[in-house]
Amino acid sequence: MPRFYNNFMKIRNALFLLFSVFVVKSFAQAVEQQKDSVQNLEEVVVSAQQILGSKFQARNRTGSAYYISPQEIQKMGYTDINRMLKAVPGVNVYEEDGYGLRPNISLRGTKAERSEKITLMEDGILASPAPYSAPAAYYFPNAARMQAVEVVKGSSQVQYGPFTTGGAINMVSTAIPTKFLAKLNATYGTNNTLKSHINIGDQKKYFGYMVEYLRYQSDGFKHFENKQYAGFKRNDLVAKFRVNTAKTEGANHSFELKAGYADEDSNETYVGLTQSDFARTPFLRYVGSQKDQLTTRHYQWVGTYLLQFSPRLKFTTNFYYNTFFRNWYKLESVKYGTLASEKRTIGQILADPETNAPYFDILSGKTDSRVFYNDYEHLKNNPGLFVRANYRNYFSRGVQTKAEYKAIWGNCYLDNEWGLRYHTDEEDRNQWDDLYAMKNEQMQLLWKGIQGSQANKITRANALAAYWLSKVSYKKLTVTAGLRFEHIELLEKDYTTADTRRTGQKRIETSNIANAVIPSLGLHYNLSASLSAFAGVHKGFSPPGVSKERRVMDRNGNITLLTENQKPESSINIEAGLRVSKQQFKTELIGFYNNYSNMLGSDLAAMGGTGTLAQFNVGEAVVKGAEFIAQYQPFPEDAPLKTPLQLSYTFTDTEMKNSFESNSWGRVVAGDEIPYINRHTLNLSIGATYSRYELNIGIRYSGAVRTEPGQGLIAERQKIPAYTIFDASAKAKINNSLTLTVNTINLTNKTYLVSRHPSGLRAGHPFGIFGGIIYKVN
């Protein structure tokens, strides 16, 4: 362990020294810059919490980017991040709960499960509970309180890691207003779904503040046979306070403190439905899931210090600390007899309910489980339902700083950025099983397990990241070059289920170290006043885990278990595109090609695995595709009627080049496609605004999806059929303070399948209508 720590400290100190040299050199150049050059410098003001800041910035990057503006979010009144992202080309999502509470997001064909292969940020800070040691965790910032969402892909994302293959998503929270503002945004509707979002804030010369509270709850659209619904409740409280100087000359300082608390209590489950039950009653919940409940608590603290010497030179430093607790108490397996072999997981039962009929009858409450033993020592050997407490604690903390330097040298515009981050995160698993008997469709506790008897380990990561990005513009050409460095040290301490008190007598330690140099290069050229071309190439990277096991299958189907140090995910990613931007018409067409030398998968319970989260080597793979978006406003800006139109389309083709076997994916044969990646997605939005009234319609088409690796025609039991969903919204602005809203989702009340995982079939949200008000005082 001392060597593990000393190596890390040596690299950290060397990079801090290198960063200091860059900063000193930049500052010296900035001091020498002439005043008239400063006055001619065009500066786009972007807050410290944003990476794009506007649609204009997104359209003028050397790589692919999309900015979901506050106006765009307000159009449809969405609270579901899946629906917010539907218009963004290159994004694949598949639903799980119907409300976007735990989204599965893929960017350019990365694995979608638990959004584990994207860099997720809130206000530019890593938002996942443990992005290095356990990226597939059950936390996603509440989309209902965000004022903007930023998506960067391709060579646009070298500053944002550790995941650089697909892209990054930055959730931009409510900012401190420029003047006094109090706002209420409340909706109520189908299934007693309530959203109440209130915020108040103000800004003076030397300070500003903002406080907001979000309450989001619903009875849910799934119900038990007794018509009892299974819903959720969420609370979110955020406060920001900033102090600053306001000099007209010289350096200015500001410090902003952000504190947040969020919780959730939901009756969510992993238990889906059988094929036949889904066809009859798609919104049914089996009584065997009546005890399933997810409880989460999240705390965040962020301090942001901004030092701005001039419009050309500024430094931004963030100190952050996040904690996340979650206990998903959910049905794991069913036991029919007293023998260990008479036990089946819920995935096995629902995949073949006929063969596992005795287990399914207990799960569905058709028959009671028997009790053979009454003494405490043997209670756990009884038949019944085993409910697992997936009890976990996470923390992440770190400090990151960046320096930005802009200048004009003759006909050249130069924009340099250097960044450095030191980060630590940890996942603590301490899980157990409880045994319940089924009697008269009610679950009764028989035996309570010992904490730590199912999983009992701590995984920690220390990471040092540094990057440099330089953009040079000369006449019609812009060249962006970047370099990122990641040094990661992982350590897993498995106390084993035999040492639930964690005495350390049976502790197993496994470690792994990863280093990566990640270059990127992007070009942007203005072919004419309205037409531009761009291209980029960059290295994709994803941190490894500590697992060292790999199962390889030969041509005859024989499995060989290999022991090796797990390598990081690595790929070479290429993109090229064209942009057209006229007054009322804008379009973009991009082709991308991601060539993996080593793709990583994860053993997720959400994908039918054992839930260890251990990563496994998939090996070589290719993901390629095309992204298209077009925006058109037929009428001039000063016309009383506006009818904005937007069309986006994504084509994605995936292929794994190796044969292997895993807990999550089973047997994979070379040529198989990656599961849960849409080959075709299309989104169309149509709006109409006249005077104080506004109407918007969104149409989303999702092509057929493969739920397990395979090739050729998709088998019916491994398929999510294609579907088209219509959403709509209407607004009436009564006066400058009050606006009335009506939002609908799934306007045609279509019953559609969204997932066959974690266990069984799941339906998307049925028709929902929600009336609301937006009231502002300023």
PLM regions: where:
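N-terminal periplasmic "start-of-domain" segments of outer-membrane beta-barrel proteins
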Residues: E43-M76, L101-N104
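Face-selective signature of the C-terminal outer-membrane beta-barrel domain
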Residues: T248-F255, T296-T497, E588
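Gram-negative outer-membrane beta-barrel transporters
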Residues: S473, I488, K586, G591-L600, ...
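Transmembrane beta-barrel wall of Gram-negative outer-membrane proteins
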Residues: L181, Y188-Q217, E225-T269, Q293-S310, ...
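Membrane-embedded beta-barrel scaffold of Gram-negative outer-membrane proteins
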Residues: Q308, K314-Y320, F324-W328, N526, ...
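Short acidic/polar hinge/loop motifs at secondary-structure boundaries
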Residues: I125-K153
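Structural signature of Gram-negative outer-membrane beta-barrels, strongest in the C-terminal barrel
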Residues: Y394, C412-D425, I450-N595, K642-T643, ...
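Extracytoplasmic beta-strand/coil segments of soluble accessory domains associated
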Residues: N82-P129
